[in-house]
């Protein structure tokens, strides 16, 4: 089972919070102290909290649960996409469109349009159009791919959200709360932990820290999914006997 050690976290700078003047007092229980006017996060808390989150995500994945990775900050964007693809899950890494979860019906129509345009771009339909019309459609395709490409095969609402930066993604968290979807999130010292079911107190800016969280989550999810596949294989083997 994937776990992360104190040493891994120290090396990645997980313990460095934000400047003390930007803190959110609700994060006080997870703060060890301050150094040079920067809050230091208490990794004695973070390590077990993160490992609990990994165990739960592993369990969700083992039951065929769908996990949506959310991280739209430029610094995290590419790493979020990579991690989600690494474990065959879903992602939003550019802009969270309001209603992405709470207005799934409308989102589903946009996904259908995206898939139609993808098919047109591949089956030669674009070549038959005027240059202008082809350009308009390929621009629309690019825009839709950017915002919905990571969830186009999700086929319904996710079973959990894994979020990098609770402050930045507060709209996504609120939507998940409204729908009762569990939220796992990296929460820095400037963020509000309310609405996060599995809080991971840690640095949400340093790319090494972000990659550490994402890599561990992707591994936990992959392991969970393979348990599910193993169970399926065992069951079909028993049936065949």
UniProtKB/Swiss-Prot annotation:
One of its GO terms (biological process) is translation. Signal peptide: none annotated. One of its GO terms (molecular function) is structural constituent of ribosome. The keyword Secreted does not apply. PROSITE patterns: RIBOSOMAL_S2_1, RIBOSOMAL_S2_2. This is Small ribosomal subunit protein uS2. Keywords: Ribonucleoprotein, Ribosomal protein. One of its GO terms (cellular component) is cytosolic small ribosomal subunit. It comes from Photorhabdus laumondii subsp. laumondii (strain DSM 15139 / CIP 105565 / TT01). The gene is rpsB. It holds the Pfam family Ribosomal_S2. Disulfide bonds: none annotated. Belongs to the universal ribosomal protein uS2 family. InterPro entries: Ribosomal_uS2, Ribosomal_uS2_bac/mit/plastid, Ribosomal_uS2_CS, Ribosomal_uS2_flav_dom_sf.
